[in-house]
From Swiss-Prot:
Transmembrane portions of the chain: none
Name of the protein: UDP-N-acetylmuramoylalanine--D-glutamate ligase
Originating species: Bordetella avium (strain 197N)
GO biological processes: cell division; cell wall organization; peptidoglycan biosynthetic process; regulation of cell shape
Domain of life: Bacteria
InterPro entries on file: Folylpolyglutamate_synth_CS, Mur-like_cat_sf, Mur_ligase_C, Mur_ligase_C_dom_sf, Mur_ligase_cen, MurD
Annotated positions binding ATP: G138, T139, N140, G141, K142, T143, T144
Catalytic activity, reaction form: UDP-N-acetyl-alpha-D-muramoyl-L-alanine + D-glutamate + ATP = UDP-N-acetyl-alpha-D-muramoyl-L-alanyl-D-glutamate + ADP + phosphate + H(+)
Cross-referenced Gene3D superfamilies: Mur ligase, C-terminal domain, Mur-like, catalytic domain, NAD(P)-binding Rossmann-like Domain
Primary localization: cytoplasm
Amino acid sequence: MNTELTSRADAPLVLILGLGETGVAAARWCAREGARLRVADTRMQPGGLEGLRAVLQEAQVEYHLGCGSHFDPALLDGVTQLVLSPGLAPGQEPAASLLAAAVSRGIEVLGEVELFARALASLAEARAYHPRLLAVTGTNGKTTVTALTRQLIEACGLSARAAGNISPAALASLMEALDQDALPDVWVLELSSFQLETTHSLQADAAVVLNVTQDHLDWHGDMQAYAQAKARLLKMARVAIVNRDDPLTLAMVADVNGLNVRSFGRDLPQRVGDMGLELGQGVAWLVACEPSDFDEPVVRRKKDAPPPQRGEGRMSRLMPVDALRIRGVHNALNALAALQLARVLELGWGPMLRALRDYAGEPHRAAFVRSIGGVDYINDSKGTNVGATVAALEGLGQTVVLIAGGQGKGQDFSPLRSAVSRHARAVVLIGADGPAIGQVLESTGVALVVAADMREAVRRAAEIAQAGEAVLLSPACASLDMYRNYPHRGQVFVEEVEELALDRGEVL
């Protein structure tokens, strides 16, 4: 650390607002760059406090903890830059008033990802470091696509780091790479709408918006603001990739040069560079629209050369959907998005498709736990919004007993009606907004059961589900009313499923 520079009285003073994972990374980076630090958080014991104290001496940081519902404007005194945590909504208190005061004083407001973008620009100038950069956003599927894209890239012999919302924070990963003298060939960033609000100068080779459905309306205020936050990413990318099935993402590229747009979807692709699904003789395939057979060598272009004309091309079958280890149509679409991102780097199909076959998915995302009595148990605890749960219901291809409920975050639950009517035998309701979901689903005629906790939910679901069906935990809600986070909720589900198996004498 640049402790000498950090302690200089004339060094710039940076205010870190919010001390979660990204706040700690930003604080460490700013200290490394020679800034003085002031840190403020609404909590007395924010999650990143111990981590920051472990790497920075107490004298290097001015702490203001337990600020509660109000940040004192005096926090801005002497500050040249304010780094905002993605956990604090800029349009809501306690951050809104302080941010307005910062802007009126001419203090720059930015986020950790913007600092990362500027760090890459500095490294390009100082060390001629010019990595490729791919970025992923969307309501659902971000982590799966980010992790899978990294795996595809590494299978082709390039080094890659996945960072951002997926964890670790982008700056934390960059500092680790610098310290290890192991800067990667490619960065793959998962970016939330929160992070994009404070990012302005990222330069991506390609970026994808996977989908936009209701989520985080308690943070953004309305769907328009939420979609606009996602759309910001495509304006910072050379190639914009969107979901043809999602009108909101298609609208984001309405004014973009078509040569710089790629798309994926459930239907057959029509233009060179697009991807989709083909149902042939009862077998679903991942397909790409290519100008030539995919086993021919790729003609390399100069980096800044415009992409070729996107005319109608030749359909290439890549692999059967059933060959994927990740389940559901939504995951087939995630696979297409990852392939498109990696394909922008002009990587060959062969290694990527082999890596795609091997990819087993991420924890708590439509993850198969086990079968008991012919019933599959699926952990989709990461399904924290209505869109994710609809995707899981429609993608599994099984009748399910759904376990849903938790903190609803101000969502409209009505989009669940159609998917539940078509795919669910029953719904077991848990958590604070379980009753609200039940109220919406009453008109479907699907059986509704209320459970006090996960143990009861799993047991009641097991009583209802029939052989060949699935018990699906996909809550459509956040978890904090009952659990530490969604991984904790998923782990409790897995434990209860394993306990059920033991009780029934089924041991793996």
